[in-house]
UniProtKB/Swiss-Prot annotation:
It is found in: Mitochondrion inner membrane. It comes from the Eukaryota. This is Assembly factor CBP4. It is a single-pass membrane protein. Belongs to the CBP4 family. Essential for the assembly of ubiquinol-cytochrome c reductase. It has a direct effect on the correct occurrence of the Rieske protein, core 4, core 5 and apocytochrome b. The keyword Membrane applies. One of its GO terms (cellular component) is mitochondrial inner membrane. The gene is CBP4. It holds the Pfam family CBP4.
């Protein structure tokens, strides 16, 4: 089938007395709308991403999210307090907010999680080594003197 005979080409072919701008507008709306819908349905939400994380990473994300939210709340309170003064912003000076530093409880919890992960990993390695040694022993016992 030749390109000139396609229905989409026929639709956009100019005819006397029919303006082209409505056709092109309809085409543009279709392209932009399909791109938007494709983006909307193909992009996972934040909850979907968190749900797919492994448990340790999810726990760490939740702890850090709480710390970030706490920092943001303090920042907003300070900004509101400074905005209530009648002085210009250059006289108020810089905000006294500190750089993002997770609180001590988050750090301790992260150390606890990492220690637990290290213990689990060491235990798994010991079990794998024991299974390999047992398998080698069985293979050694299977062989006869021949």
């Amino acid at each position: 089938m030749r390109l000139e005979n396609w229905p989409i080409v026929e639709m956009f072919r100019s005819r006397p007395g029919v303006p082209n701008w409505p056709k092109f507008g309809l085409f543009a709306v279709g392209v932009i709308g399909s791109a938007y819908l494709g983006y909307r349905y193909a992009t996972p939400s934040e909850e979907d991403i968190v749900r797919r994380m492994n448990p340790e990473l999810r726990e760490r994300y939740m702890l850090e999210r709480d710390a970030r939210q706490e920092y943001f709340n303090e920042f907003v309170k300070e900004a509101i307090a400074q905005s209530k003064t009648n002085e210009p912003i250059w006289k108020v000076g810089p905000m006294a907010s500190k750089p993002i530093d997770f609180n001590v409880a988050v750090r301790e919890k992260m150390k606890e999680i990492e220690a637990r992960n290290d213990q689990d990993r060491n235990e798994r390695i010991k079990n794998e080594l024991a299974a390999i040694a047992k398998k080698e022993e069985e293979e050694k016992n299977k062989k006869g003197w021949w």
